[in-house]
Amino acid sequence: MSISLTESAAQRVSSFLSHRGKGVGLRLGVRTSGCSGMAYLLEFADMINEDDTVFEDKGVKVIVDGKSMVYLDGTELDFVKEGLNEGFKFNNPNVSSECGCGESFNV
């Protein structure tokens, strides 16, 4: 089981954590939402819970709760800039379909 970050994503997360001044890492998860069933969660973590799995890649701790791990295993988090837009992108090998707007997915 693993979660990885591109160099671009690791730099962006490190920058956010540095400016924030606190936090142990980046928490990734999934929740039920959208027209395809699930949506990604991405937030800063101030603590690690008992059921969390912790990965470290390129100096960044990535924290995933036990329920989300089955959906996120093998995912690579990237940070992309496309024109005037920029943001994090999940490259998830478990996804079988995505909704048209790209906000939700199914496995």
Swiss-Prot record:
Disulfide-bond pairs as recorded: none
Protein name, as recorded: Iron-binding protein IscA
Record's GO cellular component terms: cytosol
PROSITE patterns (alphabetical): HESB
Superkingdom assignment: Bacteria
MF term (GO), any: 2 iron, 2 sulfur cluster binding
InterPro entries cross-referenced by the UniProt entry: Fe-S_cluster_asmbl/transfer, FeS_biogenesis, FeS_cluster_insertion, FeS_cluster_insertion_CS, HesB-like_dom_sf, IscA_proteobacteria
Cofactor section: Fe cation
Organism from which the protein derives: Photorhabdus laumondii subsp. laumondii (strain DSM 15139 / CIP 105565 / TT01)
Reported function: Is able to transfer iron-sulfur clusters to apo-ferredoxin. Multiple cycles of [2Fe2S] cluster formation and transfer are observed, suggesting that IscA acts catalytically. Recruits intracellular free iron so as to provide iron for the assembly of transient iron-sulfur cluster in IscU in the presence of IscS, L-cysteine and the thioredoxin reductase system TrxA/TrxB.
Subunit structure: Homodimer; may form tetramers and higher multimers.
Lineage of producing organism: Bacteria, Pseudomonadati, Pseudomonadota, Gammaproteobacteria, Enterobacterales
Keyword annotations from UniProtKB, A to Z: Iron, Metal-binding
Family the UniProt entry places it in: Belongs to the HesB/IscA family.
Cofactor binding: number and manner: Binds 2 iron ions per dimer. The dimer may bind additional iron ions.
Binding-site positions, Fe cation: C35, C99, C101
Database matches in Pfam families: Fe-S_biosyn (PF01521)
GO biological process: iron-sulfur cluster assembly
